[in-house]
């Protein structure tokens, strides 16, 4: 999974920070309730953000409870609802197919992926039954990605489009048709942004292992570092996707979630993208972590 989609902490009030934390903990609980303890390991900020996009506009009910990760202090969380359930189901499906893709990649170690597949097999079967349409799109687009990788596709747009269409499919169950169209556009460009940021983040490892990375073939890179031309071109592409996300965001009233989404689209993505390009995101990950109401990092 990725974990790149995070709001800017500087732009969030204490109330909104706590609200995001309660959604994150709520998603963790729903994953555990629907799919067991192993499924909680795939929890990330990206699908928390998806649940927020799908959430109704009004303030949700907030509860407090201890959990296995924090047994000595109660954590605020939102109980299960359709938005959290959808995010949980689709995160299981995407995680499963990403694991299968990793197992088919000759450039990666297999032991941890075999273990992950074993832990998620039952969960995936249940999630597939619940979200068959999303599962079908995920399989189709990841297979398309696999073919592009085999062909050493030199385009950034083609593989990014495959992942973008995959994520846009998550909007399919939004009830309101106008909101569905808004989310399709927002999630499409978010998916495109995630794919390209992940390619930049993996560049050094992919170059060393000989794994496919579209940046290597698009810019003819001779090392695991971006040239000035490649960096400039990638920044333009990433910024373009963010601007289109912002345009979609402005077309819908997201109610109590507006500030969190705004802090993500208008600043959080820029900050994460910059950190990835500077090579500081992985080493400084804690600086991007969200804190709950009790000031504990999520």
What feature does the model see in each segment?
Residues 285:
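N-terminal phosphate/diphosphate-binding loop that engages ATP/GTP or pyrophosphate donors
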Residues 262-267:
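A glycine-rich phosphate-binding loop feature that marks nucleotide/adenosyl-phosphate handling sites
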Residues 1-185, 192, 196-231, 235-239, ...:
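Acidic catalytic motifs of isoprenoid enzymes
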Residues 288-298:
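Long, low-complexity, intrinsically disordered segments
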